[in-house]
């Protein structure tokens, strides 16, 4: 990154909060937070930069034109976003729009609770797109039952299975629909020469050292395991204290013991996991369904045929999949720089506007004919020659998007189309975390430390280093080391939120 950008990014902690331009429209439009035809709204914005360079001005200028705004965006590199945010909160120098990714950061929680940011729950009903925001995700980003920002939407669940369809066909196997059938496919992929090369060189599942985004948590949801926490009558139980968690460990242990998955998965990276699949050694991948595109693109066998599965029946015959919070933080509005209700309404009107098809399409797909090609029936394609410009001009703008409207479907890639359709279908079977919107100070301070106790015990059990009773001892250690306090704090927060 050049010196110019370094200097620009360092100034985040300086004041960026100019007062919004006055409205020249009628009193009616002012009350509704809508700018008059001749009044440009000036907005200062702290945004997160997930790419090497900020987007070029061309797209920004188009957004300003469509929304009648002047955008003063400070791009903060992803690696330093928390430090810069904490410094800005401490100094009290904040722009009008603040991107907050970790809403349970202790500094952020204190800022919300102290009244530093506007509470917008009573306002969004006046804006048609904001009023249609997903109610579950809105609940997930509340703090003490209050909504302090517009969520940055992400899919609630992208988890599923990528499987070698050509291997299924070679062995005359049907697509698995239950956990038992999935196990039998893993066995056949290991023992029955699915690639028909006459060699004993394949196995079923390729997994990695990730109990969340690898296979474990998704298989757990198929088993009926709760998503992080189980709530019953106001009492909270962590997932690893349930029988379904042990059933998941036993399922994975059985796969490993019989050689139907890579034995070294606790020390396998995601790159290594994907290489095992792409190089034709494994035929089952469990994780983010969009990874199917990358697995295919890096395949050593270009004739590889893949299928994506999102529904697997558990022992009780039900289909489930675990859900994330459905967000990547919020856009929040500090009272120090958004001084009046009228100014807040102007900003809310802006976010409502960028959810409309013309602005959203510009920020997501780019300029028709330059970054993509719009087809009929709400579809689009992107040529290889258009990808680079889209990546540099448009992709960084995803950091500015709140509501994911997905007006167009990409028909240029059947695998990506399948991923999008199945991700949408997942919303019908998701299992949410009942503690998602709750706050525990002990969890915030010591959660990662305590989680390591359980993670280590889980891996050790699955590879046969400890017994079930020894695993239970580690759970007791978690409780005595602070886990009981976390449970109590969640139960109290749940009671207060009702």
Swiss-Prot record:
PROSITE patterns: PROKAR_LIPOPROTEIN. It is found in: Cell membrane. It comes from the Bacteria. Residues 1-22 form the signal peptide. Keywords: Cell membrane, Lipoprotein, Membrane, Palmitate, Signal, Sugar transport, Transport. Its main location: membrane. A lipid is attached at residue 23 (S-diacylglycerol cysteine). The keyword Lipoprotein applies. It is a lipid-anchor. A lipid is attached at residue 23 (N-palmitoyl cysteine). Disruption phenotype: Deletion of the gene has a negative impact in the utilization of polygalacturonan and rhamnogalacturonan type I. GO terms for cellular component: plasma membrane. InterPro entries: Bact_solute-bd_prot1, SBP. Gene3D superfamilies: Periplasmic binding protein-like II. It holds the Pfam family SBP_bac_8. The complex is probably composed of two ATP-binding proteins (MsmX), two transmembrane proteins (YtcP and YteP) and a solute-binding protein (YtcQ). Belongs to the bacterial solute-binding protein 1 family. Involved in pectin degradation. Part of the ABC transporter complex YtcQP-YteP involved in the uptake of polygalacturonan and rhamnogalacturonan type I. This is Polygalacturonan/rhamnogalacturonan-binding protein YtcQ.
